[in-house]
Amino acid sequence: MARKPSRRKCPTCGEAGVKKNGRTSKGAIRYRCTHCGASYCASRPDISRKAELDQFVNWLTGKNAIGDLQVSSSTWQRRTNWCWRVDPVIVPTGQIYDYIQIDGTYLPYGWCLLTAVNSGKVLAWQWCNQENKAAYKQLLKRLPEPLMVITDGQAGALSAIKDQWPNTRVQRCLVHIKRNIRTLTTINPKIPAHKALWGLAKRLVVIEDLNQADQWVGLVQAFHDQWGKWLNHKTYKNQVPPEQVPFWIRPNQQWWYTHQKARRAYNLLANQTRKATLFTFLDPSLNKQATTALPATTNELEGAINAALKALIYNHRGLSEPHMKKAAQWWCYLHSEHPLKPGQLIQPHHLKPGPKPGAKQAKPGPKLWDSAIDYDPKYQDGSLHIRKGWAGH
């Protein structure tokens, strides 16, 4: 049976009757018109653009350098320049979560990236110059109020939680509490009171039930009974040589607590115990409502999100400020709950080239650097001119 003639039309002469004529060196099918002899390759810009964006995002969120892509840097930059205009955005689902972890990580160019995470998935992010109440409020208002929020205790975060999620219970990250105690007592304390405080901090992070929590609270009370008077010891300025006065003492301050670090460490544990923010994850009423286990730390966020973002920026060190931010946003988007394929985010305006920068207008007045002298009388009286001769020699 004879083969049916091709209905594909030639883009040159417009006649039907085009047949396949091998492949190009890149593997694309080559077509040849049986009427005019023109040869061409069919193109699908939409598919090509999706493939370019997929390759671009894989490079941007991966470890490979441009040299590993088997293409010159100029070709890669020209081909993927439009990809920087695609903005990944996490669309809120409205789901109410059992818990949300919030924290910020500092990146180059003075930026701080706040993230909200559940089960290792990024729910939202917010750029800011530092962690503060306003930035955290912008982050929290995109998400419905959860049962519990885990935070490292940053003041701006706690204030924003109180305003945006007034009914949400707060869980202080126990690992951050331990780190704060370690900073005050050191990891190998010599003073007996410091040893006791460091022991309480180490015991805090391994508590798994209410019985252990009750025992720990009893140990904190026992520490106060034993060391309470010692913590209240005071040092008076008139009894200390001037060179031994601590640098942080105000000029009009007449006394201070002798054991400042031990006192701060104890107050940290005692205050958080009174506020009931250390063992929120063990609350029976919350665990009855929750469908998953409630964590006591932000380790999941610190290790899986913040550390990975810093590693990403390090692997692509040298990116400009907007490109650095776009790389972090793409990484967060790909690690959200329901990310679309990058090619599905392409919009027509992404493919249009941006406006070219206009020519800079010269500032009015004489030039500061030039190749000749301006003899315009508006700018000089004529005394400035090129000197010739031997200048008296």
Predicted regions and their residues:
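Conserved beta-strand -> loop -> alpha-helix junction used to position metal-binding or nucleic-acid-contacting
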Residues: 152-201
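A broadly conserved sequence feature marking short terminus-proximal activation segments
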Residues: 1-8
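Short functional micro-motifs and their immediate structural scaffolds
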Residues: 15-19, 41
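RNase H-like nuclease fold core
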Residues: 2, 28, 32, 39, ...
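Short, amphipathic alpha-helical "recognition" segments used to contact nucleic acids or chromatin
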Residues: 47-63
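Acidic/histidine-rich catalytic cores and adjacent linkers
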Residues: 30, 37, 41-52, 148-151, ...
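Short linker/helix segments within small regulatory modules
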Residues: 20-30
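Short cysteine-rich clusters marking metal-coordination/redox-active sites
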Residues: 10-13, 33
